Design a protein with these regions (language model features):
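Bacterial signal peptide processing site
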Residues: 27-31
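Divalent cation-coordinating acidic motifs and surrounding scaffolds
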Residues: 35-366, 371-375, 387-408
């Protein structure tokens, strides 16, 4: 199977592949079981993916009736051996708060005894979709995930840093056994040893062993001070360039760390980008709108392809939130469809395995559809994902733009 460049950040768009190829049905001996011509001219039926003719209309869910937010997602396009383009949406788990469980999704016609509970429309046209749940555990597909820890390295965060270092290896092994191909990165922020920046250290995306080695250089919050890896010098230069100066090296601003990772780290094409922000302080943008949590509300600023943020909050105190100065860091999760968890200031009542982000990754989905040839014109197209559980306890809609790429004329 040919795999093309998946997602390139554009202004408010998901770009699914910058490539040229023709979609031709090369049916020959043995191919008929895989590619079938639908009775409707021009519509291909790829084995395992229902045709658009089988698709049903998505439920209409008014915004005021939505019960949750869907996670941000990536969209990619692949050409199979027979020259047919298949679009895939990679999304982490959807939590069913009413039933206290992660939702298993079923596409067109239902599957595994489940009735359909997820729908995809492209430019208001229902698509026939196939859904793979990693929770089913058959290992037939691998989900790419690039996970970045944003760690507040102020003096009060030693226990969190120590807990992360102690648990990362076993935790990553458990995630891998769930069918995840995962890489890890880290950004330390707040109380930087460098002047005029909140970015105190970090390591680009690496293996679990690579991240553990980085964290094991020292103890406490010193674990996330300084840069390591092949591009350590480049990361330090970027951190101290002035671009990530939010007024003070002591401002604890998770948004600065997020923007740093987004702009400087080498994310893999097609990987689901996941961030976990560990902090015990408000987001402190120092008056700068670019570092405010509200930056994430606008999909032109932060597209679904750029990832979902999960929050670990280790402060039982109360705050009077002030926009642009002392902001609720959990809003980073709210605006991107992530999760939040409160833990005690000593990180003694939680493990990495307990965090909601673990369940979200272990219950990821791959949603596939085809018949996109007419959409491969280099222009943005509107994709809408609708989720409605059988008991209607979970009702949510996410809409975003995708450029599916270009095909040869």
């Amino acid at each position: 199977m040919k795999t093309y460049q998946f997602l390139t950040k554009t202004s408010g768009l998901l770009f699914a592949g910058a490539f040229l190829f023709s979609l031709t049905s090369c049916l020959g001996s043995g191919d008929e079981s895989f590619i079938l011509e639908d009775e409707i001219k021009g519509v291909l039926h790829v084995d395992g993916i229902p045709t658009d003719a089988e698709a049903t209309a998505s439920p209409v869910i008014p915004e005021n009736e939505q019960t949750t937010s869907l996670p941000n997602a990536t969209c990619s396009v692949e050409e199979n051996e027979n020259g047919v383009a298949i679009a895939s949406i990679n999304m982490t788990g959807v939590w069913d708060a009413t039933n206290n469980a992660w939702l298993n999704l079923a596409g067109t016609g239902g599957s595994n005894g489940r009735i359909q509970n997820v729908w995809v429309d492209v430019d208001d046209t229902p698509k026939g979709i196939d859904v793979y749940n990693t929770a089913d555990g058959d290992g037939s597909r691998t989900v790419l995930a690039d996970l970045v820890f944003l760690v507040d390295n102020s003096g009060s965060m030693s226990e969190e840093a120590n807990g992360l270092a102690a648990q990362i290896k076993d935790w990553s092994s458990k995630l891998a056994s769930s069918g995840l191909d995962i890489r890890f990165g880290c950004v330390g922020y707040g109380e930087s040893r460098f002047n005029n920046t909140s970015i105190g250290g970090g390591i680009n995306l690496t293996t679990a062993d690579g991240l553990k080695a980085y964290l094991d250089r020292s103890s406490g919050t010193s674990r996330t001070q300084g840069f390591e890896g092949n591009d350590a010098s480049a990361l330090q230069s970027a951190a101290t360039s002035g671009k990530y100066d939010n007024g003070s090296a002591y401002n604890e601003c998770g948004m600065v760390a997020l923007r740093f990772a987004d702009q400087q780290f080498a994310f893999r094409s097609g990987a689901n980008r996941i961030y976990v922000n560990f902090t015990d302080e408000p987001n402190q943008p120092g008056g700068k709108e670019d570092w405010s949590v509200d930056f994430l509300k606008d999909s032109k600023n932060w597209t679904p392809a750029q990832g979902t943020i999960h929050t670990v909050w280790s402060n039982y105190g109360s705050y009077s939130w002030r926009p642009l100065y002392d902001e609720d860091p959990k809003l980073m999760s709210t605006y991107t469809g992530g999760t939040s968890k409160d833990v005690d200031p000593y990180f003694s009542n939680a493990t990495l395995e307990d965090l909601p982000v673990t369940g979200a990754m272990q219950n990821s989905y791959i949603i596939r559809f085809t018949n996109i040839e007419d959409k491969m014109d280099g222009q943005p197209h509107t994709v809408k994902i609708t989720v409605q559980s059988a008991d209607k306890a979970v009702k949510a809609v996410k809409t975003f733009n995708v450029v599916f790429g270009n095909k040869e004329n």
